[in-house]
Amino acid sequence: MSGRRKGCSAATASSSSSSPPSRLPLPGHARRPRRKRCLVPEVFCTRDLADLCVRRDYEGLRRYLRRFEGSCVSLGWPSQCIYVVGGEHSPHSLTEIDLEHCQNDFFGEFRALHLIGTVSHATCRYQVFVDAYGAVFAYDAQEDCLYELASDLAGFFAKGMIRCDPVHESICARLQPNVPLVHPDHRAELCRRSRASARGRYLRSLLAFRELLACEDTAARCAYVEAHREAQLTLIWPEKHSLVLRTARDLGLSASMLRRFQRSLYTREPVMPLGEIEGAEDKTFFHRVRILCGDTGTVYAALVGQDKLVRLSRDLRGFVRVGLALLIDDFRYESIGPVDRSSLYEANPELRLPFKKRRLVVGYFDSLSSLYLRGQPKFSSIWRGLRDAWTHKRPKPRERASGVHLQRYVRATAGRWLPLCWPPLHGIMLGDTQYFGVVRDHKTYRRFSCLRQAGRLYFIGLVSVYECVPDANTAPEIWVSGHGHAFAYLPGEDKVYVLGLSFGEFFENGLFAVYSFFERDYVDEIVEGAWFKHTFAGMYELSQILHDRANLLRVCQLHAGSKIRLGGSPACTFTFGSWNVAEADEANNFVIGVLEQAHFVVIGWMEPVNKAVFMDAHGGIHVLLYGTMLVKLAETLRGFIRQGSFWFRCPRRFCFSPLDSSATVAAKPVSSHTSPAYDVSEYVFSGRSVLDSVSGTGAS
């Protein structure tokens, strides 16, 4: 037995030494195939690209771009916008002459730029550069200008081309195909004049700042400001604006306020004031804006009434180049050419800026089926969120005011279009004043008594037609007070209308309180029924004789005894003639007789409120409430038939004129504004004003 065991063990040992033992599969388990080791394929990573740019490893950046040349990355905005990786050897690369042009002719000094690829949108291509600080730029060869897209690559991939004006223009041209575009020759001339103007304004500003730029540190800058107090240094933009050098004592900035400014910064560096901005006129958006400079040379702006600083540029020379353009989100760099000492005296004072810098607005319009249900606006999630932010109450004493929630919501949903109950196909595009570029002074709104008593005001958007971007100069502005009241300011009329005392009233009525909508020109019966919902068939004949009082009275006499349904809500019936007035009592007969001596003529009766309706000597429509109490309902008989008894639903004053106006300005209809043609033109715009000699507005 022992020998046999020894033989078996020896055989086993010899077999184990010659070949490895095979692992037998366990019962119930299949044998797994052996996997081969393989290398994971490398893919393009935005973090690796950003890391190379931050470390300024330009040799590694060049190799990385060459390795992943042709890779595509979708940008954050707009949709279908692609970033294509590529370097100096890519087929769409710039020439050396173009690269030197971008490095020398845009910033007033040489700035090293490294090409990292191109951005493709529609049929356009934009070369993308990164500088030594990590900022990303895009070059528009058609207009010969640079756009600063973001301060780093992470912001570039998140924001995309939202700072590039040609992309906004192409999107607006696609949304509004009927709007005529600027002729290419005229546009080229505007760009040439803009480049010449930018160079002249930059040379003047550089000449004014040359001594301050020579200061090497903060102590030297403080000494220069102290020695040159009240000196005015011209800015490149805005025009006719300058930086007035002032110390902290002159500006009223205490040490605690400077520390508060310092805590609002990301790096929390010490800051020193340089001065404040003054313009040619006091009514300017940039008046009293304070300019501060940090120890690292970064220039900040302190807006009026705010405790946070806004970063303008990384150094003082950059501030001389851009001015206050970043406050309106203008990141465009014009080609100003090379600048040296001999060119500082080339500034031509006759050069003017040909067109105003402004931010383009892009709206987001949902389909009509998702906005309306049986002709009425849906109470969508955007409306619901606006209501919650509008009616927010403070549950705790230390929580911020409700207006902060409303402002945050409006900024988060900027560009969304919400339909109004009336007029048809009209709505409000949400956004704050910075989004639309509204730069009016608050004194403009404080001229109205209703806004003086409203407390704090919050801007929530502009009124526009469906699929049309509003114009900030003419579109009605919607404001909300701290008490929850809704107001509409019409710049063309310079009037304020009270739309509602709550969110529910604003949502139910829309712009029905804006009387100028009811003085539009007559189009046809279908439009009259869709807009105003009255049953008067002779509206066309009535529109031809609005300012002829004798013919108006003749029309009322011809329709004596006929009943019509007035527009608006609540539903009321109007009877032409004066037959029902004869049945009034003796007191009312006496009042009516006195009014007739004052050239007030009875033209009919309103039911079911049972009130007599009068026409004054100028064609205005009044209603007799009780005793000698008269309320003016409309400027013309046409406006009265269209708007109807809306005042009886909300018996209060709707329209307010400025307190400093010496004479009452005629209320022009909204249709008199010059606007491009749209697909819904039969509902909206016409080109002729119908009120030439009328004073006041409805229910004023």
Swiss-Prot record:
InterPro entries: US22-like (IPR003360)
Cellular compartments annotated: Virion; Host nucleus; Host cytoplasm
Key words, A-Z: Early protein, Host cytoplasm, Host nucleus, Virion
One GO cellular component, as annotated: host cell nucleus
Pfam families in alphabetical order: US22
TM helices/strands, residue ranges: none
Feature: compositional bias, Low complexity: 9-21
Domain of life: Viruses
Region described as Disordered: 1-30
Recorded family membership: Belongs to the herpesviridae US22 family.
Complexes and interactors: Interacts with UL38 and host HDAC1; these interactions are necessary for the HDAC1 interaction with UL38. Interacts with host MTA2.
Record function comment: Contributes to activation of immediate-early gene expression.
Protein name: Protein UL29/28
Organism classification: Viruses, Duplodnaviria, Heunggongvirae, Peploviricota, Herviviricetes
Gene giving rise to this polypeptide: UL29
